[in-house]
Amino acid sequence: MGILDPYKGFGVTFSTMFKKPTTEQYPEQKKETAPRFHGRHQLNRHPDGLEKCVGCELCAWACPADAIYVEGADNTDEQRFSPGERYGRVYQINYLRCILCGLCIEACPTRALTMSNDYELADDSRDDLIFTKEQLLAPLRAGMESPPHPMRLGESETDYYTRDPDAPLPWQVGGSPADEADEAGEAGEAGEAERAADKVPAHGAGSERPR
């Protein structure tokens, strides 16, 4: 051991003392993620609010960690959640198992499942790390209507995927789908009121006044 060896060790220490620290002040200062970052999943919607997920379970089959659980159900004319024949009634992702590989995104045929930039998934409860459909669904934006409701962008599922994405939506000329539904309901109530009024006999010739 040379006499200068201790000074060499301190030289490394002193040289780093005057360098700018690289510690990130998290969570006060969060680093921006890459555009194609693999974060928390999101279930997307169509412009009218219907869900893109058709309950095919291809994402669950593609998951190498067996982290996705899907139960599909049939749509009806009264209860429609997606343009297709089926929708995802139950959708769960277990983030205790998920490795954020993105294979489920590649397997999805309708682009219903994408990955967001949200990476803050730590929790002290195992149950809270099993995300349900309500937690994964994208929030309703302006012009969207909460399902179940009829199809607003066409008469079949094909119309939803063949429409021009740059074309204006039907309700952009007027109001939102919910406003159209309210107007239709008000028109129906007004028509019923008019029919009821027609059935009431008018007081005049040939009618008796109540005593």
Swiss-Prot record:
GO cellular component: a single term: plasma membrane
GO biological process: aerobic respiration
Note on cofactor: Binds 2 [4Fe-4S] clusters per subunit.
Compositional bias per record (Acidic residues), positions renumbered to this chain: 179-191
Catalytic activity entry: a quinone + NADH + 5 H(+)(in) = a quinol + NAD(+) + 4 H(+)(out)
Molecular functions (GO terms): 4 iron, 4 sulfur cluster binding; iron ion binding; NADH:ubiquinone reductase (non-electrogenic) activity; quinone binding
Required cofactor names: [4Fe-4S] cluster
Protein location: Cell membrane
Keyword Ribonucleoprotein belongs to the record: no
Binding site for [4Fe-4S] cluster 2: C63, C98, C101, C104
InterPro entries in the cross-refs: 4Fe4S_Fe-S-bd, 4Fe4S_Fe_S_CS, NADH_quinone_OxRdtase_chainI
Bias-annotated ranges (Basic and acidic residues): 152-166, 192-211
Keywords annotated in UniProt: 4Fe-4S, Cell membrane, Iron, Iron-sulfur, Membrane, Metal-binding, NAD, Quinone, Repeat, Translocase, Ubiquinone
Membership in a protein family: Belongs to the complex I 23 kDa subunit family.
Record's protein name: NADH-quinone oxidoreductase subunit I
